[in-house]
Amino acid sequence: MIKWPWKVQESAHQTALPWQEALSIPLLTGLTEQEQSKLVTLAERFLQQKRLVPLQGFELDSLRSCRIALLFCLPVLELGLEWLDGFHEVLIYPAPFVVDDEWEDDIGLVHNQRIVQSGQSWQQGPIVLNWLDIQDSFDASGFNLIIHEVAHKLDTRNGDRASGVPFISLREVAGWEHDLHAAMNNIQEEIELVGENAASIDAYAASDPAECFAVLSEYFFSAPELFAPRFPSLWQRFCQFYQQDPLQRLHHANDTDSFSATNVH
């Protein structure tokens, strides 16, 4: 029987966090008990090291905090929590938020505009999220705001800016870039054929390599059945980097469900 880490060091003066309830979301159902235990251990440390800051009246309770921490730690389950160094706060709006965006065009003119954002991440600075999209990240649907922003953090460990190439060995970089750009081109071809709304992969992945890595990281964990057969070579690179195989988890979970169904009387 598994010994849950959050029960081992409870004291009479502490209120146990609702980890078992927090784990009961579709995205995490494929994890083994050992993986769940390891994930909770990381998430506990995450909550000790990072500050979750609710904004604009958003109410942050213990269950929400636990689920946010679990999603942050899923991508680094095998990499280690030190991969999430470089920020200390997570700012959480109740819904998508408006920011002032400044950008420079091809001839050097600077433009300012207000845009709606779901999340933001910088190399050194807080991660900004919104609860509506965090809730939508609980399902195994291919969308996951937290994993998207974590992927940007992992990406910037390789240099000053997000490039779509995480911190991997130098001999792997050329192959990674080749497969990533091939995926971007494939996604763009589908968009041109059927349109952004009908594309099977989020069109944002075709915008630049950094966004492609972040979007495909979402699919890696929450819709591996879409990612793996379409980009098998890149899939293997993601498996090697994250040291996880969500497709194998999905197959195991489906086999378990099928076995349970056949043994119901």
Curated annotation (Swiss-Prot):
Disulphide bridges, residue numbers: none
What is its subcellular localisation? Cytoplasm
UniProt name for this protein: Mlc titration factor A
Per the annotation, which location comes first and is thus the protein's main one? cytoplasm
What is the species listed in this Swiss-Prot or TrEMBL entry? Escherichia coli (strain 55989 / EAEC)
**Do the record's keywords include rRNA processing?**
no
Q: Where does this protein have coiled-coil stretches?
A: none
Required co-factor(s) are: Zn(2+)
Family, according to the entry, reads as follows: Belongs to the MtfA family.
Q: Where is it found, in Gene Ontology cellular component terms?
A: cytosol
